[in-house]
């Protein structure tokens, strides 16, 4: 006979660790803005995006949605004791500057701002021009 399975386990919660210094990774695309706040080793402490804070469709790509997402991610990270972040910005989207300003206004001290947008060395063909 097969071994009997145990009763349903409780989901294991990770204990909250104190992270005073971290990194904020802002990925701003044409359709959305995603903010991930990590500890110095790269483990995600908190995250938020335009869709996560309640925006749908084309409203996710607005600077206002990026600001709200950054504020939400900062509040969650500050519950872990985060005080200072180094910001890494990636992508061409409209929410880049607004997200950085929202991190500052939420109470996080911004140490440095680095643009890590990847540059293609003549890689894939770009999308065709829009005709409106």
Swiss-Prot record:
Function according to Swiss-Prot or TrEMBL: Located on the platform of the 30S subunit, it bridges several disparate RNA helices of the 16S rRNA. Forms part of the Shine-Dalgarno cleft in the 70S ribosome.
Compositional bias (Basic residues): 7-16
NCBIfam families on file: PRK05309.1 (NF003698), uS11_bact (TIGR03632)
PROSITE patterns reported in the protein's UniProt record: RIBOSOMAL_S11 (PS00054)
This protein's encoding gene: rpsK
Keywords: Ribonucleoprotein, Ribosomal protein, RNA-binding, rRNA-binding
One protein family per Pfam: Ribosomal_S11
Protein name per the record: Small ribosomal subunit protein uS11
Highest taxon of source: Bacteria
Family stated for the protein in its record: Belongs to the universal ribosomal protein uS11 family.
Subunit structure comment from the entry: Part of the 30S ribosomal subunit. Interacts with proteins S7 and S18. Binds to IF-3.
Organism: Bifidobacterium adolescentis (strain ATCC 15703 / DSM 20083 / NCTC 11814 / E194a)
GO biological process, one term: translation
Keyword Magnesium assigned: no
Region: Disordered, residue numbers: 1-24
GO CC term, one of those recorded: ribonucleoprotein complex
MF terms (GO), sorted A to Z: rRNA binding; structural constituent of ribosome
């Amino acid at each position: 006979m097969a071994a009997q399975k145990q009763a349903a386990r409780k989901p294991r919660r990770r204990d909250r660790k104190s992270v005073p210094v971290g990194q904020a990774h802002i990925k701003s695309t044409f359709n959305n803005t995603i903010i991930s706040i990590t500890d110095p080793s790269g483990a995600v402490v908190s995250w938020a995006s335009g869709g996560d804070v309640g925006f749908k469709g084309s409203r996710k790509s607005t600077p206002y949605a990026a600001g709200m997402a950054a504020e939400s991610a900062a509040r969650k990270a500050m519950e872990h004791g985060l005080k200072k972040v180094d910001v890494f910005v990636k992508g061409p989207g409209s929410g880049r500057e607004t997200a950085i300003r929202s991190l500052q206004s939420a109470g996080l001290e911004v140490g440095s701002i680095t643009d890590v947008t990847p540059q293609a060395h003549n890689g894939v063909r770009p999308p065709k021009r829009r005709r409106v």
